[in-house]
Amino acid sequence: MGVFPKENPINVIIAVWPWGSYLGDEGMKNGIRVKISSFSRPHINATMVRAKTVANYANSLLAKREALKDGYDEAALLDTDGYVAEGSGENIFMVRNGKIKTPPLTAILEGITLDSILQLAVDRGYTVAQRKVTLEEWRSGVESGEIV
């Protein structure tokens, strides 16, 4: 077989089920505790980070495990330059001063949810920006209550 399975068949499975609140109803009601993970989001050129493949979730799995072990509800991963990238299983959005910010596609997994949220925000009159977010900017906004 080797690392190039040219002649192997490709099998696809699609599973669908009701999901509910990703971090639970309590998390939605009371908020969650987030740990900045020691694991980072892989660099965009390191592997196929734009594809939702099982192997690309290794860092997210390790980050979530680390957060839970340390008493947190969720993990946030930084990119390889130290900027806020994403949660272990979700995109991160900052709502500050009436503007919605999210990390650029060079640091996060592009997907339907991200596109939908950004489009809905624009449709509702929000200013939206995809740009690098420093950890200090994120922390100061959370601590002051400006970021929700």
Residue ranges and their predicted role:
Residues 2-148:
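Helix-start/capping segments and mature chain N-termini
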